[in-house]
A protein has these predicted regions:
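Assembly/interface hotspot detector across virion components, adhesins/toxins, and nucleic-acid enzymes
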Residues: 83-86, 114, 119-121
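Short, basic amphipathic alpha-helical segments that act as recognition/interaction helices
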Residues: 26-53, 118-150
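Charge-rich, solvent-exposed alpha-helical interaction surfaces
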Residues: 18, 36-37, 41, 67, ...
Length: 150
């Protein structure tokens, strides 16, 4: 089996509640549900290719508007940011361990570099945080349809 890349991430209470509700239905853990949803979304993203994965309301998005069918459109940076927690509170905001193949992590790194969101890259261009891509993928999943971002 290929070596996995582990990424730890804190999710907002609202995202955790949705994942927790689904985990209770499936009689499993939040991390298991999150990993399954992310694998589904990554499959969709990788199928269309990185050049057709865009964040809404960006110049890349506007360039694709005539041809959005067959693209993967993430919510806006502001919408995603509302569902990212930065509190270092393990009791209320415990980390979730997410697992990806090396190929998937490289694909996501390409998207992070393409998005150029402040705080996600180091000065040398390497990835500091995947949180906008990961939370964006979760919010895109039909399980989060009630958020009104799909």
């Amino acid at each position: 089996m290929a070596k996995e890349v582990k990424i730890n991430l804190r999710l907002s209470m609202r995202v955790r509640e949705v994942l927790n509700d689904e985990a209770e239905v499936e009689d499993t853990r939040i991390g298991t549900v999150a990993n399954r949803l992310l694998q589904e979304e990554l499959g969709r993203m990788m199928a269309v290719g990185a050049d057709r994965c865009v964040m809404k309301d960006t110049k890349e998005y506007r360039a694709l508007i005539p041809h959005l069918e067959g693209s993967y459109v993430l919510p806006t940076e502001l919408e995603i940011n509302r569902h990212i927690t930065t509190r270092l509170d393990d009791k209320n905001y415990p980390q979730v361990s997410l697992y990806f193949t090396k190929e998937q992590a490289e694909f996501m790194a390409g998207l992070v570099k393409k998005q150029r969101i402040r705080g996600t890259l180091y000065y040398d261009g390497s990835v500091k945080s995947y949180r906008y891509v990961i939370v964006g993928m979760l919010l895109k999943n039909p399980l989060f349809a009630d958020f009104g971002l799909n």
